[in-house]
Amino acid sequence: MLKPEWLRVKAPQRERIGAVADLLLDLNLNTVCQEASCPNIGECFAGGTATFLIMGPGCTRACPYCDIDFDKSVRELDPTEPERLGEAVARLGLKHVVITSVNRDDLPDGGATQFVACIEQVKQRSPLTTIELLIPDFCGNWDALATVMAAAPHVLNHNIETVPRMYRLARPQGIYERSLELLQRVRDDWPRAYSKSGLMVGLGETDDEVIDVLRDLRTHRVDIVTIGQYLSPGPKHLAVDRFVTPEQFDTYRRIGEEELGFLQVVSTPLTRSSYHAGEVQRLMASHPR
């Protein structure tokens, strides 16, 4: 299936990309931009931003839509990773940083303490930087969630990824209701935090199912939603079922913001969960907590 015109990405600024990539290489850090083959890597690297991927690069889950390598082996966490991440944030001069991770189901707390260590390093080295976490479901370990939230990230993101009907195919180790519960707990127990979630379209869902997911997310008090086109990483991954038009993406946005009352819905074909995440700062300023 050929990509439509609206999914073509502008050529990146090689000099700026090289500078960011060199810094990440120098500090031995992974980014989801690189590991997940994000289509926005040129724009984000050119803007001096990146979403850091900790505890990887291998993931203990093998979701068939994802380009991150599967690795079920038990691996020790790197105690120097948080310090190196904090240094990168300071050297890049980031106003807003996104920290995500692979799934680490081999760890009792799913890696919660590593998230906390990273938050502490960022706050120490770059105290004015706002912090957004994109976390896994911790297999429903709510103590692990509490550990992370006690470190006071400004934004807590957990992606719902797809509609419930597609979970068995696309996210076999995930549970739709568990992800909703996680998002609800964030807003109920830590009301000053902004909650965020995202989903892909083009996996085989219908537009009505997408709207139903938006309703579920709003019912569970989610503040911010991102919606983007699924692009298959390769022949061993799930195929694209359809290319959703920019007009339909705008319909999702309009329904989410105007009818359901989300603080923000970022919905375009190339949107990914941390795409233009720095705009969250403006949202926080206009809706302070």
Curated annotation (Swiss-Prot):
InterPro entries: Aldolase_TIM (IPR013785), Elp3/MiaA/NifB-like_rSAM (IPR006638), Lipoyl_synth (IPR003698), rSAM (IPR007197). It catalyses: [[Fe-S] cluster scaffold protein carrying a second [4Fe-4S](2+) cluster] + N(6)-octanoyl-L-lysyl-[protein] + 2 oxidized [2Fe-2S]-[ferredoxin] + 2 S-adenosyl-L-methionine + 4 H(+) = [[Fe-S] cluster scaffold protein] + N(6)-[(R)-dihydrolipoyl]-L-lysyl-[protein] + 4 Fe(3+) + 2 hydrogen sulfide + 2 5'-deoxyadenosine + 2 L-methionine + 2 reduced [2Fe-2S]-[ferredoxin]. CDD domains: Radical_SAM (cd01335). PROSITE patterns: RADICAL_SAM. One of its GO terms (cellular component) is cytoplasm. Disulfide bonds: none annotated. Pathway: Protein modification; protein lipoylation via endogenous pathway; protein N(6)-(lipoyl)lysine from octanoyl-[acyl-carrier-protein]: step 2/2. It is found in: Cytoplasm. Binds 2 [4Fe-4S] clusters per subunit. One cluster is coordinated with 3 cysteines and an exchangeable S-adenosyl-L-methionine. SMART domains: Elp3. [4Fe-4S] cluster 1 binds at C33, C38, C44, S274. Residues 45-263 form the Radical SAM core domain. Pfam families: Radical_SAM. Its EC number is 2.8.1.8. It is an enzyme of class 2 (transferase). One of its GO terms (molecular function) is lipoate synthase activity. [4Fe-4S] cluster 2 binds at C59, C63, C66. SUPFAM superfamilies: Radical SAM enzymes. The keyword Magnesium does not apply. It comes from the Bacteria. Its cofactor is [4Fe-4S] cluster. Keywords: 4Fe-4S, Cytoplasm, Iron, Iron-sulfur, Metal-binding, S-adenosyl-L-methionine, Transferase. NCBIfam families: lipA, PRK05481.1, PRK12928.1. Belongs to the radical SAM superfamily. Lipoyl synthase family. This is Lipoyl synthase 1.
